[in-house]
Amino acid sequence: MDNSRPFELEKMQAELKEAGLDGWLFYDFRGLDPIAHSILRFASGKMGTRRWFFFVPAEGEPSKLVHAIETAALDHLPGSKTVYGTRQSLDAALQEILSGSSRVAMNYAADNPYVSRVDAGTVEKVRSKGVEVVTSGELIQIFESVLSPEQLESHRRAGAHIRGVVDEVFALVGDTLRAGRTITERDICDYANKSIREGGFENDHDPIVGVNEHAADPHFEVPAEDSAEVRPGDLLLFDVWARETKPGSIYADITWCAFIGSEPPEEMLKVFSVVRDSRKAACERAHEAFSSGEEIRGCDLDRVTRGVIAEAGYGEYFVHRTGHSLHECIHGNGAHLDDFETYDDRKLIPGTLFTVEPGIYMPDKRIGIRSEVDVYHTGQGAEVTGPPHQEELVRIEI
C-alpha cells in the first residue's frame, strides 16, 4: 500500500459526524490489522510487538495509547499520548480515552472477515467500558477504496495491458499448435508473467491458467513442472491481473475462456452463455442503480448473478462470490459482491472499483467457465473498464 499519503484527520472526523458515531477506535497487536496500518499511514516494515490503541473522536484531539517499550509506535500521528506498562494500566487508560463516548466504530464485523480484523477478546474489552462497538466497514471503504483520478488512470493502463496479454496468449497457443509443437499451462503462465513485467507492470501471483478439469478449479495453481498440455478439443481458462510498479497503482483483473478448435461442445457453449448473461445482468443492474442514485450493496449484485445462473439450472456449480474490491491490492478493502461466502452488506460507493466474475465449474464434465470484468462506479453510472469484453467463447483454430 502507498502509505506516503497524509493522514486525513479532518475528513475522518467529518465522516464520523455524518455516521452519528462518537469515534473510531483503531487497535493492533503484532500486525494483525493491515487495514489500520494503511489508514493510519504506517511505514512499511515497521516493527511492533505490543498492543496499541488510537482513538479518533468525532470532535477534538485524537488519543494514542502505547506500551512503555514501544513509546514511539504512533509518533507519526497527531494526538495526545498515554504510555502503559501493565495490563491494569492499559485498562484504566482505555477507560479514560473512551469516557464520554457511547458508540464507536472498530475494524470488526459479525459476518465479514475482510473487515473483521480486531479479535473478539479486544472487542469484549472495549464493550466492558460501557461502549457500543459497531462495524467500521463503511468507513473503511471511504478511506481505503475510493480512487484518485491518477489511480483510475493507472487502472486503465493496467487493464489495457492485460487485455493485450489475453490476445497474445491465445495467439501463442494457436501458433504453437498449428506448428505442431506442444504448449503447457506452465508455458502460458511464464509467457504471461514475462509480458506483464516487460510492459512495466507487476502481479502478486502467477495468473490462473487451467485446461479442462483445471479450468473447473476456480483457484487452480499451475505447477512449476509437469503441468498439463493444451491440446485440440480442450477448454482453456485464463485469469490475469496486474498493476503498474509505482506506489499507489491500482490493479486490473480479467478472465477469458477459449476452446481449442472450431466446434465447442453444445453444453460448453450453453454454460458460457449463462455465465456471460449473469455477468452482464450484474453490470446492468449496477449501472441502473448508480445512474439513478439508488443505494445498492455488494450482496445485492451477488444475488443478481446467482439468480441468473440458478434459473438456468447451474446454481450448485457457482461456488464462489461474484466479485471483489479492486485497489492497490488485488483483493481490496471495499465492498465485495458477496452474499454467498460472507455477507457483505456495504454500499457500493462512487469512486470505487470492483470485479464481476461469475463462474460455473463442473469438474466431472471437464468444464469450468468464468467471465470477469472490472467495474468503476463513476457517480453517474457503472463503467465496465478494459474493453473489448468477452461476448462469445473464443475459438482458437488449429
Regions found by a protein language model. Give the residues of each.
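Active-site neighborhoods and metal-handling regions in enzymes and metal-associated proteins
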Residues: M1-I398
